[in-house]
Design a protein with these regions (language model features):
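Boundary of Sec targeting at the N-terminus
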Residues: 18-21, 164-165
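Substrate-binding/access-modulating region of protease and related hydrolase catalytic domains
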Residues: 22-27, 241-313, 325-328, 354-360, ...
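Catalytic-core environment of secreted peptidases
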Residues: 184, 188-201, 321-363
Length: 439
């Protein structure tokens, strides 16, 4: 039993300090543990494979249900990712390219000029009777040098959990000076008590308000501890869902980034995931080139899932989630896109109507990292994403294998209680000084 516990502890990634305390016993029982490991490892591999299949099947089922319910507005690409039906995004098209598209029956909508990012996007509607896949193929044949892609959909990477709300958080606002931070998500309930004291500016949906569970929960963790906001925090919230159950689209996310760039918001949280997309990729790269720091959830599709975006784009800070015992969530994505970890389970967060609910997922770990990054940036406004990542990593506690790894990245960032203790002892100031001294 002890040997099995040791093997499982190693698999779950105990902190190095705990492993070091067990080292003499491990050496004494090495022959036994090695034998058990040979027996246990295949079982763990099969369990992980079963989990991956279950998560993949669940996501496929969710997508099929959405497609069945909203077939009038949804379609799929060649990899079965959900897209806006009949819509193709042309990135900086030439006049000749647009003329060819019109001649083939496409209708071009008003260009979206994202001047703050230096981008122009023209949505094109496919001719009647032509599928979205056929539309993409047609445009790429008509204009091989042009850039055309689907308008992919992006959804949250976490949700509510069952059970009543406990007392896991203190209800005390985060320490330190107020920070400025951006959010691209679903709608936020600005009247929620958990956001009282925060300064909220909103964008999207033609000014209409669509408070949503996911956006409100993420916002409450971005400006405070989920139950109370740090007074004076400025939250710039872009609603790219607008009440639609299908999620946000690539065009909306790009426009949200452009608005945040226009507002000179340097740190942005993106707790949404989806496939690679040419427009989103260019928008993310343009934002980063202009000094913005993007923090994104890595997703909950399981350890074997392909990297999800935008977290997998270069220089985006990808965040995974652990439980209160520092164990990575089984459903969390793994890979090179994982930069940091934060607690993302058994958290209390705000939901519309003045309510609170427990939440789980990488969606709710990412705002902890984004809030820390915003605080550090307030100390050194000229720091870039690499410098901030280095400062965050300096605060992080290494988990799993020594050094950066595909499960925990560079380690677990401090929780609010840890931050308060660090602030009182000078630890946070030390991290800020590392940002100031970064090249």
């Amino acid at each position: 039993m002890l040997a099995q516990a040791l093997a499982l502890a190693a698999w779950l990634g105990l902190a190095p300090a705990a492993s070091a305390q067990l080292q003499p016993l491990q050496q004494a029982t090495a022959p036994l543990t090695q034998g058990v490991s040979r027996a246990v490892d295949p079982l763990l591999d099969r369990t992980t494979a079963s989990l991956d299949r279950a998560l993949s099947q669940a996501r496929q089922l969710q997508q099929r249900q959405l497609l069945r319910r909203h077939r009038d507005v949804l379609d799929t690409d060649s990899y079965d990712n959900l897209v806006v039906r009949g819509q193709v995004l042309a990135l900086a098209p030439t006049a000749e390219g647009l003329a060819r598209a019109r001649a083939a029956g496409f209708t071009d909508q008003a260009p979206r000029r994202l001047e703050s990012l230096g981008l122009e996007i023209v949505p094109l509607r496919a001719p009647a009777g032509q599928s979205t896949r056929q539309a993409i193929q047609t445009l790429r044949k008509l204009d091989p040098a042009g850039s055309y892609d689907y308008d992919h959909l992006y959804s949250g990477s976490g949700g509510l959990t069952t059970g009543s709300v406990g007392s896991g958080t203190s209800g005390t606002a985060a320490s330190g000076s107020p920070w400025r931070v951006g959010l691209i998500d679903s709608g936020v309930d600005a009247a929620h008590p958990a956001l009282r004291g925060a300064q909220l500016q909103r964008w999207g949906c033609d000014g209409q308000l669509h408070p949503d569970v996911h956006g409100t929960a993420v916002a409450s963790l971005l400006v405070g501890d989920g139950r109370q906001a740090q007074p004076g925090v400025q939250l710039f919230a872009a609603d790219v869902y607008c009440g639609a159950p299908t999620g946000g689209n690539a065009l909306g996310v790009a426009q949200g980034l452009a608005w945040l760039a226009q507002q000179q918001v340097r740190v942005v949280n993106l707790s949404l995931v989806g496939p690679d997309n040419a427009v989103l990729k260019r928008a993310v790269a343009a934002a980063i080139a202009r000094g913005m720091v993007l923090v994104a959830a890595v997703g909950n599709d399981g350890p074997a899932a392909a990297p999800l975006f935008p977290s997998a784009y270069p220089q985006v800070i990808g965040v995974t989630a652990v439980d209160p015992r520092d164990r990575v969530l089984p459903e969390a994505g793994r890979g090179e896109q994982v930069d940091l970890a934060a607690v993302g389970a058994q958290l209390q967060a705000a939901t519309p109507g003045g309510k609170f609910q427990r939440v789980r997922g990488t969606s709710f770990a990412a705002p902890r990292v984004a809030a820390l990054a915003a605080q550090l940036l307030a100390a050194q406004p000229n720091a870039d994403a690499d410098a901030l990542l280095g400062a965050l990593a300096a605060q992080a506690r290494d988990l799993g294998k020594p050094g950066p790894d595909p499960v925990y990245g560079r380690g677990l960032v401090p929780g609010l209680e840890d931050e308060r203790a660090a602030t009182s002892s000078g630890g946070m100031e030390e991290a800020r000084s590392q940002v100031r001294s970064a090249p």
